[in-house]
Structure formats: C-alpha cells, structure tokens
C-alpha cells in the first residue's frame, strides 16, 4: 500500500486515462483501428492484432467520460495547467466529431453526428460553468508568456513550457531571420491562405473597383486596387500574416517604420528568406528582443474554447434544424475577432444559408480562426477534402516580388527611406505601392501536385512494426 490519499490516486488515474485517450486518438485518426492495450503485458502477450476502429473509439470515449467525472474544474499553484474535466469533455467532443466525419463515416450515419453534437454541447456547457470562454482579443492566448495569457479562460489544454529548464522555439522559429537567430521562417503562409481571409466586414474578399456593388477578386499581379490584397482584411489577417512592406512589430526595431521587405534581392539571402513571399506573425511576442528570442517559454495550446465552439457549430449544422445556434457561434467568433457587425448584425455571414452552406461556413471559419494551430490538415483529411475536384492537380502557390524599373537601382536602405518618405503606411495601402513593386505568381512545388483518392486517407503501418508483430495487418488502401 502507498501513502497517496484515495482522492489523489483517483485524480492521477484520471489524468492517465486522458493521456492514454489522447495518444490512442492520435493513432486512430492516422491508421484507423490499432492494437488496444489496456493492461500490463508480458513478453508472450506482446503480439496483439489491430482492433476495430469502432472499438478503439468506444474505449477512448469511455475513458474520457470516466476521467471527466473525477478531474477538477481547475488546478492551482504549481499544478496550474494540469488536465481538467473540461479538457476531457472537449477532447471527447473532438474525437466524436472526427468519428462522425466522412473519413470514418462513409455512409454519413446521422446518429454519429447527433452523438458528436451532444458531446460538444455538454463540453461547452460544462466549460462555461467552470469559467471558460473566449478571451477579449484574438491573440489573447499567445500575445505573451504570462500566466494571464497562458492560463487565460480560453485555454483548455496546452503543453506548458518554463524557461530555462524547458524552452519553446516558436517565437524564434516564426520570425524572419533578421529578427531571430538560427533556423527560422516557420509557418510561411501560402498565397491560397492569404487570399482566403474575409474583409474587415466579414464579407468575401475582393474589391469593388467600379462602385457598382460588385466585387472583383483580388489579383496579386494587378497594379490597381485588385492587387492590394492586404488592405481592409479581417483583423485576424494582421495578427497572422506579414506581407511585403508591412511593419513587423517588435520592440527592438531600429526605427518606427522598420518594414519587412520580401522582394527578390531586398531581403536576407534567398536561402534563408521566405519561400512563399509571406511571413507569419502569429505566436509572436513583440517585446522579446532578438538576443533573447530563444530564451523563451510560450505554451503550445492544443485545445482552446474557440475550437470547442466551432466543433459544436459543425455538428449542429450537420444535425440540422439548428441554424440559429450555428449563426450565434459564428457571430460570436467573428465579433471577438473584431469584424464589424454591419446593419444586419451578421458580421458578413450570408443570411438564410442552406445546410451545406452552413457546414462550409463553419469549415471556413475554422481555417481562419485556427490557422497555424495544427487543425486544417486534419479537417481536410476527416472531411476527405483532398479528393475534391478543385484540388485535383493542386500545387501550392507563392508570390515573387521585384522592384519596378524605376526603383530597381535602389539599395535596400535607400528603398526603405524612399518608401518611408511621405508615409510608408499610405504607400503600402494605396496604388502608390505599385510604383515600387511588381508581383508575379508561381508554383512552389509542381513536383508534388495533389492526387488523392478515397483509399489514401489512412496511413500505412511502418514496415518495422509489421516485422515485429506477425499479427498486425497492413492498412487497406
């Protein structure tokens, strides 16, 4: 017998159940059914066949339900950040959302969507009772490494870092090299993502050049307003994307208008510059100076309240007859982002959407709200979107920016001074920009065009595991 109290022992066991569920779900969403090990094995019992996917999901869900009945609503002191009942319920909702999605639910069984809806609604309601909710600002969970941000009411489950024993590289890795040290330039946005963001009023991206109320889509190669694709966008754009000429907002900028130029020949050497023409600024703490950029400990958020809301909205849209609930959630997300309500108070959303339009609206909002949080790839897999005709032969696109003939003789320093003269921000946001720069669109990776069929949505088991366990069968496909 040990010295732990029964209460402490049960809470440790509940956390272990959560972690086992989390790891099993990571396997199941990749491979489908996997060997389900629920007790200590001896060597003779180590070869176990794959279990059915349905059995694995059932075990994961049951374990999370059990954990949620034991875990507290929060932890204090040095235990702050441990797994809570809200985290268990939120993960349960995510698991059932995946299981209801097309990758696992080829016949679109409505009962699975109802179960996913019920689980996510229960998670939302419990989280609200426990004090969770949206932060007042979009970047409130990562704007700095204070407990006020990292343990804010929106954070449900995260990987915690603590300098100097356990440092995080995200703040260093996302920045351009001239603002960081070592390997940088992570999370470089593709043109497709950049063009996807809605406008500041939540409407579809584009510009009404003729004033007739009809928008023309942005065209990065145009030299009129259609080419100013960074102007007037969703506020989340500017907390995620950095385009040529924007100020990268850091405390140790040498001067107020120190801009990030990404044109060819104007940046750091090409081997270390952006491969897409863009940088990301999400997860950046502006007050961290270049010399300290790797001495940092920003937590990595895995589940936040906004995702739970979007999980619920997607399930509500699929279940049907819950349109007001879907609209309420989408408006709440957009209002917090800073999008204007407009006269109809729909924050740019189309009125009276069909069921499919609502589903598409939720998936779109997930793409924008959760950008660079590790969700989009899995959304596309579980929805089997890689097989959609629009992605057949798809290859990622980038922009290449060059100086115009009138400015091509300017050095980077002279260009920066010339651009700043008279107001760099006004030049950046007007057609005066095209006196300095011209843009072309190119493919990033023609060698890797998408061609995914319905048998490619579960990964093959690694050969070494098949060799180590004769009872394992390879994934079909």
Put a short name on every predicted segment:
Residues 1-175, 179-184, 205, 209-477:
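Acidic/polar-rich alpha-helix caps and helix-coil junctions
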Residues 192, 200-203, 211:
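Glycine/tryptophan-enriched, flexible segments
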Residues 183-194:
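Active-site core of glycosidic bond-cleaving carbohydrate-active enzymes
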């Amino acid at each position: 017998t040990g010295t732990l109290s029964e209460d402490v022992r049960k809470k440790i066991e509940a956390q272990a159940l959560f972690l086992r569920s989390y790891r099993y779900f990571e396997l199941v969403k990749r491979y489908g059914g996997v060997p389900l090990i629920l007790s200590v094995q001896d060597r003779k019992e180590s070869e176990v066949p794959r279990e059915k996917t349905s059995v694995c999901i059932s075990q994961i869900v049951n374990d999370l339900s059990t954990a949620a009945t034991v875990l507290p609503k929060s932890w204090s002191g040095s235990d702050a950040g441990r797994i809570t009942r809200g985290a268990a319920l939120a993960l349960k909702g995510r698991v059932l959302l995946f299981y209801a999605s097309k990758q696992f639910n080829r016949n679109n069984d409505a009962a699975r969507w109802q179960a996913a809806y019920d689980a996510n609604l229960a998670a939302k309601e419990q989280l609200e009772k426990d004090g969770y909710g949206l932060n007042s600002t979009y970047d409130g969970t990562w704007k700095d490494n204070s407990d006020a941000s990292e343990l804010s009411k929106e954070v449900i489950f995260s990987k915690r870092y603590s300098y100097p024993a356990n440092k995080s590289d995200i703040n260093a890795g996302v920045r351009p090299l001239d603002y960081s040290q070592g390997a940088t330039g992570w999370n470089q946005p593709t043109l497709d993502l950049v063009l996807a963001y809605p406008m500041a009023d939540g409407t579809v991206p584009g510009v009404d050049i003729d004033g007739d109320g009809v928008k023309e889509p942005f065209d990065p190669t145009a030299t009129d307003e259609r080419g100013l694709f960074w102007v007037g966008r969703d506020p989340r754009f500017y907390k995620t994307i950095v385009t040529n000429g924007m100020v990268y907002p850091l405390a140790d900028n040498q001067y107020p208008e120190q801009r990030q130029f990404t044109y060819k020949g104007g940046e750091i050497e090409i081997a270390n510059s952006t491969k897409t023409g863009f940088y990301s600024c999400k997860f950046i703490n502006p007050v961290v100076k270049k010399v300290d950029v790797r001495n940092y400990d920003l937590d990595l958020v895995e589940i936040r309240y906004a995702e739970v809301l979007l999980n619920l909205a997607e399930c509500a849209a699929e279940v049907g007859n819950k349109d007001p609930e879907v609209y309420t959630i989408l408006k709440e997300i957009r209002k917090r982002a800073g999008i204007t309500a407009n006269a109809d108070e729909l924050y740019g959303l189309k009125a009276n959407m069909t069921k499919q339009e609502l589903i598409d609206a939720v998936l779109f909002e997930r793409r924008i709200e959760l950008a660079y949080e590790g969700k989009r790839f899995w959304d596309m897999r579980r929805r089997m979107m890689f097989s959609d005709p629009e992605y057949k032969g798809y290859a990622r696109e980038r922009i290449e920016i060059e100086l115009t003939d009138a400015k091509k003789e300017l050095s980077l320093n002279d260009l920066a001074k010339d651009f700043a003269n008279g107001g760099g921000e006004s030049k950046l946001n007007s057609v005066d920009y095209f006196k300095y720069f011209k843009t072309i669109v190119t493919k990033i990776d023609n060698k890797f065009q998408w061609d995914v069929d319905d048998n490619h949505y579960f990964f093959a088991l690694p050969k070494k595991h098949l060799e180590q366990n004769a009872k394992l069968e390879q994934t079909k496909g």
